[in-house]
Amino acid sequence: MKNIDPEILGLLMVKYGEDEQTRQAMGECGEFIAAAQNYYRAKKYGHRTETVKDLIEEAVDVYFMMLQVRYIDQDMFDEIAEIKYKKIERKALAK
């Protein structure tokens, strides 16, 4: 996967502003939810090819937007991400 240059994220924040990028992130999350619903519906009825692509495309959009949300306060984001990671690590390793 291509790493996103932090400078590009900064340019986007300057160009569009924190509020607009946050609203865009909300929209992308909504599109991901819709794609996930369509994926499960198609999975049930056996027509998955296009819905898998749609699901992944929306997941990538959300991923890029979350990188921009991280740009708002990188230290706080990373601190919380570390706590969340430890939580899922415990769940994964629990017997």
What are these regions (language model features)?
Residues M1-K95:
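Flexible "arm" and connector segments at domain edges
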